[in-house]
Amino acid sequence: MEELTDFYKQKSAYEDTTVTTVLHQWMGGFPQDEAKAFAVISWGSSVAALAKATKVIVKTPHEAIGVPTMEANAQGLRCTKQAISLLADQELKSSALELEKAIIKEETRAIVDKSFELGKGDLALGAIRAVKAGVIDIPFAPSKYNYGKMLPARDFEGAVRYLNPAHVPLPKELVNYNLNKIEHRAKMEKRKASFQMVIDDVYAISKGRLVGKPK
């Protein structure tokens, strides 16, 4: 994301700006057991550390219970700091990762370029119009302005894919790539690719799995 941000900053004459990246720790269902909840927090922290995110939105071991206490918030922060500190000097390199990065870049370009087009060069205006048109679409977002038609699901290995891109303007080859990955999961699980996968994935981590499996 930082590479693409630098590209668009130069393209749009915003080179004197600083853009930060953020990782939100798991936003779905959390396990009620605090030890298991800390594992989920550590998992998200590890992703943030390896991705070199600028900041992290931290969860607590009380996510499944209700409003966290001050002490629970502090525990979540300490757990996150420890995990990030342990991985501060580590890098993840693999051909599979490079492929995923290339795909994410193409998907991002498709959305950002369309937003520029909708705004006729004005990205602020383009972003507003893109949200209204569903070009920028956030799954499960509570905002009344969000289009809310795009649906994600994990593939068999746990990567998040587009089950239904809706109005997100992905090139046909990327739509097919995403669907093929989900169809492979469906085949391995002996079921159809459907909205049930989305539901299963939302609750999977609270049940101790990354990918939601059928009963």
Predicted segments, located by residue:
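Helix-rich catalytic cores of soluble enzyme domains
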Residues: M1-K81
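Acidic, glycine-enriched catalytic cores built around paired aspartates
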Residues: A53-K215
